[in-house]
Amino acid sequence: MENKQQHRWVLYILLVIISIFMLFPVLWVISSSLKPSTELFAWPPSIFPNEITLNNYISAFQNANFGRYLFNTVFVTITATIITLIINTMAGYALAKYRFRGSTIILVFFLSTLMIPLEALMIPMFIVLKNLGLYNTLWGVIIPPAATPTGVFLVRQYIMSIPDEMIEAAKIDGASDWKIFVRLILPLAKPILATLTIFSLMWRWQDYIWPLIAISDSNLYTLELALANFVGEYSVDWGPLLAMAVLTMIPLITVFLLFQRFFIRGIMMSGMKD
């Protein structure tokens, strides 16, 4: 019993040490964003600011057009997440509960796209984007990555854990396929929908490569593009840049804290039935 207690304490100490190493860069960014510019490069460096100031955050909104970039990112993220949920949920439900010839082949085809490097898809996706007239628009950032094989697979695996008898009972009661999907499947699939929501929000909020290709107008930049372009050729205004980085992190952390219970449950349930 004592050995178990000792092992547990050792494990806790290791987890605390690892957590400190993981969180230190984040804490440093937050602390540095509250420092005046003269203190950022002072020697010896200090973890906590001697003088707290919000000038960096004010400058980010007034001089760096942060509000515009934030609006673009929120619009892209929320719209893309809604489209992703609709497409992936319907596709996952069809592959999980509908028996038709070629369903396994379609699933394998979806999953096989995960083995193709994203860079190999960029040129054909860009050509299609330009031919459709979506280049240099926010919709050009939203639509192409909407259907994700990872999302389809997760939803399909979770819905397979729902007993077929429930669907058959609903059909006996006269429910249509659409009513079964909306009134039965979606409420039962809340955990995996929350998981997919978190994944989609993270993917779209942090996406850099595809917006870089699909957008050239600086007024349409997302936060990731804005942060990258905030670095000048000869100098970097570190104060506002750090403030923008902190403001960029807050929404993702908030979403994860709100949905983490569903997130963990959804991931666990997705692998329960093959």
Give residue ranges: language-model regions:
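A structural signal for multi-pass alpha-helical bundles of membrane permease subunits
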Residues: E2-D274
